[in-house]
């Protein structure tokens, strides 16, 4: 039995070689598997690392976003598929495609407005011209047919876009296609769009293609052109120039239509039948198409602007048309004068306001007999402000915006500046919002001292543009030059305990040229810190560390100095107690005055009763009882 077991337990050389080969193959496969898994994991890690590097948010900016954005970003990062996973061909199970809805405030919608405004403008300019001038229609018939039906295609597409254009309801964009279609069909635009797409040009089959007036219903799409003008005026940086151009365009279109109607009336009455209508086309100089249109345009311009003499009308219909033209011309003239006058006033309003400030300062300096040198410096300072467009009062401009938008604009404008200050690097987002709203732009002239050694520090400054010099007491020797992005005075406004310099300036800083600085006052900082006590303590600790690093703090002063926070709290408590006492005293004084008044009235009544008794009058019983009660 043992022998059998021994024989069975000893494999043959062939079996051993096969097993060794299988074992080696398993080792190779396991090694390749581990290597492949390692390569896949390294590639996944590298892709995530590169993705994180590409989209690493600024930690300073991150503090201005709420937790909702962070949750969204976390969900998006968790939703990234693993390298080994395969997406289903339908894009994911249970995922429903959202319908395409156009946001009316998006750039895509504005670009579509630009595209649809072109065929509308084409129809308004050329349909009437082709209907009145036969040569223009017949000589370029193929071109007009292509343009007409291309415009019709855009009209149809515009109806589809309008049916998918979202609208706001309770502040949210409605994206339900059924509600969008229902909302669109209830508007006047839908009715006009339907009327503008009625295929009236099917009458071409019976009348011929030389009747473009059959397509006049395409003019009902004018609302798209007006909407394009309104949105362009809102988006452009030169609204006054655009308004003037828009007004000129409207005037030219009216003159163009009037010229075409004049030529059509002349054709109806008969060319050359009288002095008012267009001359006889049998003459070669009046037979050309260009001469026909230019002559009609010239007549229309003279009539509507009433600046020239035209041949007087002869027939009744001619008189009626000229009267209507005169009335339209008066309206055009009044509109142009009024609009251009208001636009010019709006364009010159900043200059007029700024010039009024300069004039008032000049009058004051002349009245106070200011030296010519100082007066010249003041005028140059004003010139610098105007030349560099620094005359805008930011608070006045932004006063109509809500606080949230004010904060976002301030963050967008001043965030890069505030990031450069060390003590504000790790502040709370709410405190940073408060601080950026309190930054005030300040401009210094050449040679102006921003601060001098020993002055009490009430502001800190951040250099936006310009150069400042740290000078010696003699005002000549320069130690260092501060440029864009530098800041100073941040420690003095914190009033840190134990500072060797206290809250006084330790250097003389002077402006070399014109310098633009941002100023943050101590009062504004403390007002913002009242709602953030933890941030206040953190700022003070950070300022104390900076002073200790520069060996500018005295530990003995820290130990000996009374805690200013306790003193401030006591002062605040005393102020509140004083307010309460004043209120109580005022109430007691009012009660005392009222009681005195009642007492005087009672004494007066008693005196009158005593006088009556002394004079022999017998008062009634009720009065005597009242007097006894009063006694």
UniProtKB/Swiss-Prot annotation:
Can you say what this protein is called?
Answer: Cyclic nucleotide-gated channel alpha-3
Q: Where is the composition biased (Polar residues)?
A: 1-18
Listed binding positions for 3',5'-cyclic GMP are 489-490, 492, 505-506, 550
- Single GO BP term: retina development in camera-type eye
Question: SMART domains recorded for this chain?
Answer: cNMP
Work out whether the entry's keyword set contains Mitochondrion.
Answer: no
State which residues carry a glycan (glycosylated): 280
Q: Where is this site: Central gate?
A: 333, 337
**What is seen without this gene?**
Progressive degeneration of cone photoreceptors. No cone photoreceptors were detected in mice older than 8 months.
Q: Which residues lie on this side of the membrane: Cytoplasmic?
A: 1-111, 161-187, 230-239, 345-631
User: Mainly resides where?
Assistant: membrane
Name the UniProt key words of this record, in alphabetical order: Calcium, Calcium channel, Calcium transport, Cell membrane, cGMP, cGMP-binding, Coiled coil, Glycoprotein, Ion channel, Ion transport, Ligand-gated ion channel, Membrane, Nucleotide-binding, Sensory transduction, Sodium, Sodium channel, Sodium transport, Transmembrane, Transmembrane helix, Transport, Vision
Region annotation Disordered: where it falls in the sequence: 1-21, 71-98
Which residue stretches, if any, does this entry annotate as coiled coil?
Answer: 567-610
Q: Name one GO molecular function term.
A: intracellularly cyclic nucleotide-activated monoatomic cation channel activity
Sequence segments annotated as region (Selectivity filter):
306-309
